[in-house]
Amino acid sequence: MRPVVRVIREDWADAALPLPSYETAGAAGADLRANLPPESRAEGLVLAPLGRVLVPTGLRIEIPEGFEVQIRPRSGLALKHGISLPNSPGTIDSDYRGPLGVILVNLGAEPFRVAHGDRIAQMVVAPVVQAGFELVEGLGATARGAGGFGSTGTA
């Protein structure tokens, strides 16, 4: 069964902007748009190089139990402008009901303007498995062992 994420708009949000949507039939992520407060819509938000900003979407969501929403960067913004998410993927738990915002970071050399209505991120709805944790005396051996970063080679 396809999960349904329930959505409400903030009182101040621009109802003319579309809800999150998938651009293609095979898309994994639904696009999220910047829904700026009325006083910021004309000028947008300017993100300085190495700066961070919390961009409002004007939405609150109810995620079905057993699922999460992952907020991920848009590849075009990352490649063309250096715009990404510092906590990628950002996790939204099913019991969160607060405002949905997207933290953007500008890793580029130039200021970047976020305009009202811009597609700023993708949200992926994913199932969650909550594991149990057990304290043990030792861990099973593997071929890799404790080899960490780069231990499996570079090619």
UniProtKB/Swiss-Prot annotation:
Keywords: Hydrolase, Magnesium, Metal-binding, Nucleotide metabolism
Enzyme class: hydrolase
Matching Gene3D superfamilies: 2.70.40.10
Transmembrane segments: none
E.C. number(s) listed in UniProt: 3.6.1.23
SUPFAM superfamilies the UniProt entry points to: dUTPase-like
Pathway linked to the protein: Pyrimidine metabolism; dUMP biosynthesis; dUMP from dCTP (dUTP route): step 2/2
PANTHER family, A to Z: DEOXYURIDINE 5'-TRIPHOSPHATE NUCLEOTIDOHYDROLASE (PTHR11241:SF0)
Family to which the UniProt record says this protein belongs: Belongs to the dUTPase family.
Function per UniProt: This enzyme is involved in nucleotide metabolism: it produces dUMP, the immediate precursor of thymidine nucleotides and it decreases the intracellular concentration of dUTP so that uracil cannot be incorporated into DNA.
Protein name per its UniProtKB record: Deoxyuridine 5'-triphosphate nucleotidohydrolase
Organism: Cereibacter sphaeroides (strain KD131 / KCTC 12085)
Designated gene of the protein: dut
